[in-house]
């Protein structure tokens, strides 16, 4: 899983949160201003007969990352090919637990998979951010040889008073469902690396 950055990455760690062969990357992105952004790059395996018969592993990975960022004071971005559509119960649960925002809401679907089939495309690639950011631009880029289109997202870090942005809130049923998913895979939010900003 390659991650390329024009900005310095520090305290980087590659980890295998749920499955021993599915990596994720956790790092701090250092801005020229000196601000640090806690960033998590994920690519859980999709539910499919050739990879995982169920979505349990993918769901657990998303939930433990959501729980790990929920109380973060620093700016946070979680991004990657999550192998899940934007409207799924699991993606909505991720948003509720993490408190992160989906910049696509109200702006379009931005279907990124599959580049070869215009009549069957799904928004599998995601970027979620904390309310430290506002959206400047979001668009799907042209194909570049992959079976996914790139999702270009330009965010602005608001260093003063943050604009109040609405996200989803988890209720007791959501939290119980998340606990069951995580317990089934024997993982927890403490398994997710939390790059320190100091």
Regions found by a protein language model. Name each.
Residues 1-197:
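Soluble catalytic domains of enzymes that build or remodel membrane lipids, polysaccharides, and related
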């Amino acid at each position: 899983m390659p991650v390329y950055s024009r900005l310095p990455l520090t305290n980087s760690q590659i980890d295998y949160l749920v499955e021993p062969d599915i990596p994720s990357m956790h790092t701090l992105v250092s801005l020229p201003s000196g601000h640090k952004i806690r960033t998590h790059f994920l690519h859980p395996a999709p539910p499919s007969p050739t990879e995982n018969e169920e979505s349990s592993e993918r769901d657990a990975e998303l939930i433990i990352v959501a729980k790990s960022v929920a109380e973060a004071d620093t700016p946070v971005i979680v991004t990657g090919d999550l192998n899940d559509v934007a409207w799924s119960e699991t993606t909505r649960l991720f948003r509720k637990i993490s408190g992160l925002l989906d910049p696509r809401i109200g702006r379009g679907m931005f279907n990124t998979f599959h580049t070869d089939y215009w009549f069957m495309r799904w928004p599998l690639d995601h970027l979620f951010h904390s309310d430290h950011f506002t959206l400047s631009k979001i668009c799907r880029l042209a194909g570049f040889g992959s079976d996914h289109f790139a999702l270009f997202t330009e965010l602005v870090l608001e260093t003063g008073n943050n604009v109040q942005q609405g996200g989803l809130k988890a209720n007791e049923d959501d939290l119980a469902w998340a606990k069951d998913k995580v317990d089934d895979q024997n993982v927890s939010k403490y398994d997710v690396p939390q790059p320190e900003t100091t």
